[in-house]
Amino acid sequence: MLIAVEGIDQSGKKTQTELLVKKLKEKGINATKMSFPDYETPVGQLIKRILSNEIQVPIEVKHMLYSANKWELKPKIEELIEQKYTIVFDRYYQSNWAYGLANNLSIDWLENLDRDLPHTNLTIVLDLPPKISLKRKEQNRDIHEQDLEYLLRVRKGFIKLASENKWVIVDGNQPVDTVHDLIWKIVSERLKHNLQ
């Protein structure tokens, strides 16, 4: 099973991804986490330089690189699927779509970039007002995390895509344990359904 935990910057994706993997393991399920962008790969290192404003590229190139970062790791993802792992993604192709829409790119073009990547069985969007995102991390923000108007557009993109793609929206503006319990309820129901 492939699960993506999505949302704008500082919505709690990393924390909730880690809690979900821990819970899955406690239930005897082989589970692992993958995060994107993955800054350890050659493309990931280039993305890091772009996000820190060290180098500038056209917006289309940036989104092609986000996709290429996943393609670099496609063999690893497929290997984990083959080994029957449940993979929980802290961002996956869904982020590229939502951020791309915020940059006025075509959803068809964005989807084509990721068309042959392994697709998720479940996508959970942690919804958070951008003003709260900005309060959660006030220092060392990347170029996207600093722009309130941009984050508002990204949030709008996630909500639109969620309704079109049957993604599940969870209110991320709650205590960590409450959000985790809501996510676990959704995931455990999906796991039961998959076993039937």
Q: Predicted regions span which residues?
A:
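Hydrophobic anchor at the beta1->P-loop junction of P-loop NTPases
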Residues: 5
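P-loop (Walker A) phosphate-binding loop of NTP-binding proteins
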Residues: 8
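ATP-binding Walker
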Residues: 11
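Walker A/P-loop
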Residues: 14
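NTP-dependent small-molecule kinase module
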Residues: 21, 131-196
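ATP-dependent small-molecule kinase phosphotransfer cores
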Residues: 29-115
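A glycine- and Lys/Arg-enriched "phosphate-lid" helix/loop adjacent to the NTP-binding pocket
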Residues: 96-156
